[in-house]
Amino acid sequence: MINNEVSRKYSSALLEVALESDNLSRFKEELEGISKALKQYDDLKKILYHPRVLPDDKKEVIHQVFSDKVSEPVFNFLNLIVDKRREVYLDFIIRDFIKQANRKEGLVKIEVVSAIELSEKQREQLKNKLKKALNKKIELKTKIDPGIIGGIIIKIGDRLIDGSIKHQLDSIKESIEKIPVTELGVIQNES
């Protein structure tokens, strides 16, 4: 619960700065880069999140890693997070900022899972249909999972649309298993 409160407070403040300075897309891109760096470089995350590493040392690491990669407001924001001892919430803050920024931009991130790779044409058709249905800008991410056999699974936020053959087969199997044996006309061996 405190994660949500802290992340919302800081992400909302940064969002306000981004909107006032007309830098929403830039801030979002920079924060996505920071998030990627934290995931990619475990040592960076360990230093920033460790409670015994002094704030000045953390700020020096931030300077070395990000000073030439992010704008001054985002750089200052990172230092503020360290000054306020909120580094452990950085992932949550970034995630919340990106969600709020996407909402402001009318952007929806959608993940599509298919058994085989979708062609560029199929991706574009799907993207256009989703764009029309949702009346939003779409950012489409595709994944391949041969285990779904065929069809596609679409994940939109918390919603899941499962049009996979595996799901359909599982549904059929479940329906068949619910039918009492006597209704199937199967004669049971009486021993």
UniProtKB/Swiss-Prot annotation:
Subunit structure, interactors included: F-type ATPases have 2 components, F(1) - the catalytic core - and F(0) - the membrane proton channel. F(1) has five subunits: alpha(3), beta(3), gamma(1), delta(1), epsilon(1). F(0) has three main subunits: a(1), b(2) and c(10-14). The alpha and beta chains form an alternating ring which encloses part of the gamma chain. F(1) is attached to F(0) by a central stalk formed by the gamma and epsilon chains, while a peripheral stalk is formed by the delta and b chains.
Keywords, comma-separated and alphabetical: ATP synthesis, Cell inner membrane, Cell membrane, CF(1), Hydrogen ion transport, Ion transport, Membrane, Transport
Protein name, per record: ATP synthase subunit delta
Localization per Swiss-Prot or TrEMBL: Cell inner membrane
Keyword Transport included in the entry's annotation: yes
Organism field: Halothermothrix orenii (strain H 168 / OCM 544 / DSM 9562)
Function: F(1)F(0) ATP synthase produces ATP from ADP in the presence of a proton or sodium gradient. F-type ATPases consist of two structural domains, F(1) containing the extramembraneous catalytic core and F(0) containing the membrane proton channel, linked together by a central stalk and a peripheral stalk. During catalysis, ATP synthesis in the catalytic domain of F(1) is coupled via a rotary mechanism of the central stalk subunits to proton translocation.
PANTHER family: ATP SYNTHASE DELTA CHAIN (PTHR11910)
Species lineage: Bacteria, Bacillati, Bacillota, Clostridia, Halanaerobiales
GO MF, one example: proton-transporting ATP synthase activity, rotational mechanism
UniProt cross-references to InterPro entries, sorted A to Z: ATP_synth_OSCP/delta_N_sf, ATPase_OSCP/dsu
Membrane topology designation: Peripheral membrane protein
Pfam families recorded: OSCP (PF00213)
Listed GO CC annotations: plasma membrane; proton-transporting ATP synthase complex
UniProt record similarity statement: Belongs to the ATPase delta chain family.
